[in-house]
Structure formats: C-alpha cells, structure tokens
Amino acid sequence: MIEDIKTLREEHVYRAKLAEQAERYDEMAEAMKNLVENCLDQNNSPPGAKGDELTVEERNLLSVAYKNAVGARRASWRIISSVEQKEANRNHMANKALAASYRQKVENELNKICQEILTLLTDKLLPRTTDSESRVFYFKMKGDYYRYISEFSNEEGKKASAEQAEESYKRATDTAEAELPSTHPIRLGLALNYSVFYYEILNQPQKACEMAKLAFDDAITEFDSVSEDSYKDSTLIMQLLRDNLTLWTSDLQTQEQQQQPVGEGAEAPKVEATEQQ
C-alpha cells in the first residue's frame, strides 16, 4: 500500500512537470491537487512524519501551477474590465453589458481556483507543516490568494478578503522575522507581496514604501552571509523591491505636487507594482 502511494505520488509529480513544460497550468494544478488530497497522510501518520508533507520540489510545483492558472485570468480580467469601462464612457451600453457578462465569467473562474488552493492550504497543508520555511511559504500563499480575490470582489467581499489576506501575511511575517534570515528568498518574497498588498489593496502607499524599504535594508545589512543556493533568488527579489520603491516614491511625489484644493485637482494615476511570480 505504501509503495503504491509512493508510485502514485511520483506519477502526479511527473504529470505536473509535463503540464508545466506544455504550459497547461490548469492541468498542472489538477495534478498537484490530486497529490495533496490523495498522497499525504495515507498511513494515519502523525503530522510531521516522513511523507506527510510536501517536499520543496512538490511545494514549488504547487505554487507555480496555481500562480500561472490564476495569473492568466487576472490578466484577462484587467483587459476586460478596461474594455467595459471604455464602452461605458462611450455610452455603448449593449457592448458594456456584454463585457460585464464576460468579466463575470472570468471572475467565477478566478474565484473557483483561489478557493480551491485556499482550501488545500487551510485543510491539508498548514495543519501538517512542522518547519518554519514551509509555514511562511504557505501563509504567504494564503495572503496572495485572498489578495487576488480582493482585486475583483465587490466592496463587502473586498473588505472580508483583505482582512483574511492581512491576517495571513501577518502570520507569515511573524514567523519569517523570528525564524528566517533577512536574505532568505521566501522572507524577501513575502515582504515584496505584502507591500504590494498595502499599495494596491489597502491604498496605503507610504506604508508599502516603508515595508519594502525595511526588507531591502535588512537584507543589505546581512547580504555578506547570504547562502550560495539563495544568492540568485535573493538578489532578484531585492531588485524587485527596489524597482517598486522607485515607482512608488515617484508616484507619491507626483501626488504631492498635484495636490490642489478640493474639487480642482485630479487623482494621480496609479503605477502597477511588481510582485513575486
């Protein structure tokens, strides 16, 4: 029985890798979902027992699969929403209604995928996690997918999902700051995406800048001790943090320069932040 589970687990991993190479991310996500649901804790073993958690490779495959499955639809949602707004501005209400219907279809797909991975994280993965790195990784993922839900939800739904995202990011940050070095790529990626959450969802650009700058400065201070394995990933994420800081600082300065009496000024356009892929 145990040998059968091991073979099945290896098959799911191989299917996920095949799907990744073919850029068929929905099927990649399905393979990893099947692995999580059917290949963990099959021997009624206690949490933390060998085989009860995802390996680093499996964890990364899961992340890549759902990130890309959601990412394609997030891009579609932005395009369709823009078209819908343009049709409304032109008073083409029939076209606007068609665009709105299509947008709703994409939102339903987005919500389904986000809820699916959130269920896996909450019910299957986090309860079995015993090491700090995986705990940070999974709570960061929870924050990310609640953030994605916030992007397309109505006001009430946005508030609820933003609160869940905030809680998840906070729990990830508490563990990361206590257990992981400031140069660790997972800790840096968490700071990157958490700061994007403050900028794009909570509309707190000053807080986003402070968070990104603190993570960057802390990593610079300890950069001499970065491990060889982490060097490439850490430097890449630090560059993304710096890029966002540059964009956000410029945006804040522009808004300050454009400040005028109420009713006379226009809101400065938002720059789009970069998050960890």
Swiss-Prot record:
InterPro entries: 14-3-3, 14-3-3_CS, 14-3-3_dom_sf, 14-3-3_domain. It holds the Pfam family 14-3-3. Residues 252-277 are annotated as: Disordered. Disulfide bonds: none annotated. Residues 267-277 have a biased composition (Basic and acidic residues). Belongs to the 14-3-3 family. This is 14-3-3 protein. It comes from Eimeria tenella. The lineage of its organism: Eukaryota, Sar, Alveolata, Apicomplexa, Conoidasida.
